[in-house]
């Protein structure tokens, strides 16, 4: 919404907009390390949004890395030619994944919370499965998830995890289900995410 501060500003630890005067907002300088952390959080937020059953909705410019606190600083002109190339490329990749993957775009949906700092979305359609996990903590979260852990959402307890997943955004790391427990073991990076796509049996 155009009535709220930009998401990248919020995730880069900007102070609440009501605590600064308009002049202070105009001159506010973000700490570089906070922006780096903010981008990691932004990628996790985008990954979560694109994994949900409803159509993704992005406020113009968020995909370009625009920042700003309250009006009018949150409603600047689109930065043509000055977009953040990494954020823009990431959103394009996410969009392509959702468009080409039936599970992400129209699959059954169920949710799980491995711990207080992590959240998981499982989407399934036919033979395809997409598992998205986000971590809001400043440390790595390790978890082991099975289909029985997905107890919330419209299709709770009516979804299945795949036997094998590959990481869609890193090095293509393949994760296999433990056939004894039926669980997939994952390590979710600090302030980050994993987006895992099922692999067909060879």
What is each residue range found by the language model?
Residues 1-202:
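Active-site and adjacent substrate-binding regions of carbohydrate-active enzymes
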């Amino acid at each position: 919404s155009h009535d709220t501060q930009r998401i990248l500003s919020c995730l880069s630890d900007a102070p609440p907009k009501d605590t600064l005067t308009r002049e202070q907002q105009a001159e506010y300088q973000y700490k570089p390390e906070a922006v780096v952390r903010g981008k990691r959080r932004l990628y996790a937020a985008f990954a979560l949004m694109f994994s949900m059953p409803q159509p993704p909705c992005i406020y113009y410019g968020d995909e370009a890395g625009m920042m700003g606190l309250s009006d009018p600083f949150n409603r600047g002109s689109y930065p043509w030619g000055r977009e953040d190339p990494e954020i823009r490329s990431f959103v394009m990749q996410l969009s392509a994944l959702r468009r080409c993957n039936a599970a992400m775009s129209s699959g059954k949906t169920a949710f799980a919370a491995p711990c207080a700092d992590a959240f998981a979305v499982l989407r399934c359609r036919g033979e395809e499965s997409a598992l998205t996990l986000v971590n809001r903590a400043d440390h790595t979260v390790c978890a082991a998830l099975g289909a029985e852990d997905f107890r919330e959402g419209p299709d709770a307890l009516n979804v299945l995890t795949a036997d094998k997943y590959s990481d869609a955004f890193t090095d293509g790391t393949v994760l296999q289900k433990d056939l004894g427990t039926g669980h997939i073991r994952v390590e979710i990076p600090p302030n980050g995410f994993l987006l895992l796509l099922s692999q067909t049996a060879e």
